[in-house]
Curated annotation (Swiss-Prot):
SUPFAM superfamilies listed in its UniProt record: S15/NS1 RNA-binding domain
Gene: rpsO
Name used for this protein in its record: Small ribosomal subunit protein uS15
Pfam families: Ribosomal_S15
GO biological process, one term: translation
Biological source species: Citrifermentans bemidjiense (strain ATCC BAA-1014 / DSM 16622 / JCM 12645 / Bem) (Geobacter bemidjiensis)
Amino acid sequence: MLVTEKKQEIVNAHKLHDSDTGSPEVQIALLSERITYLTEHFKTHKKDHHSRRGLLKIVGQRRGLLDYLKKKDVERYKSIIAKLGIRR
């Protein structure tokens, strides 16, 4: 799981203004970090199907946020894709 310090570091890197914690960019970055963590987890725990379902749910959430951002502002979408290295 994400430690509070790591989560705060991600929020600070992607926030749009001082008190920003809920913008799509921040949410996408946090979900991406959780996806990375779970992907590493599955390299050692191949039979953890319960968590794998959670991973698919998180990937779907991130996909929805990315679709929303693409529809709302294409430049911000391209920026976050490039910054996080998400293939799309």
